[in-house]
């Protein structure tokens, strides 16, 4: 059976930047509006991290029982590798999604109860990604969902729970974060394009083809750089976000050079690192430019 280390690996900790970056970005925007509330930021982080972990275990379970993980080029999968019983992985997914739900309910009730409906949509989206009879992740809509849930909803939701409003800076940050989060999934699906095709998993990469998927990945990173310049209208300090440029360029290199399969795995790590560095830098700039409410 799976060891503790394998269970941790099954949670796919390298995807956690998708949870951390939007909360950092949203809190930075709240600070810009003189309304940062750090305990709410921590609660939002619990929501996001638990959601990502729950999604990862849910994907492991759903893909594993379908057999689509049997020949994956990426990280070890618990069900696909026969290291854990499907029911055990499903239980782990339910625990993660439950923790996210409870923390989200608390955050919504203490901020704006109507956000409960938004949270319910996020939980449903997390499960239906691969868990339904017709998973939308198999239809090419995964990147769109990531853009919405880990970009628009996560950033603007974090901002709203603290400031009780959103502004154009938050919207630009949300679009930027969504683009970066989506680029991680684009890179993941580019790596798995051949095995996904064989498994009849029609991800966006499979639908676009290899060349266009590589172009999309690069376009998403470039778009974030352009939007960082736009943020300099709010405060020139946001230029510090460009410190992530070398990391983004390093992530692009294997994509531009035509690497395939497992050789693209480092792209996911480097893209996630670039996303976190960018979010911390821009949020820090906005925090310093505004006054923080403790």
Swiss-Prot record:
GO term, biological process aspect, one: menaquinone biosynthetic process
EC number, as in UniProt: 2.5.1.74
Annotated metabolic or biological route of this protein: Quinol/quinone metabolism; menaquinone biosynthesis; menaquinol from 1,4-dihydroxy-2-naphthoate: step 1/2
Compartments reported by the entry: Cell membrane
Keywords: Cell membrane, Membrane, Menaquinone biosynthesis, Transferase, Transmembrane, Transmembrane helix
Family indicated by similarity: Belongs to the MenA family. Type 1 subfamily.
Identification of the protein by name: 1,4-dihydroxy-2-naphthoate octaprenyltransferase
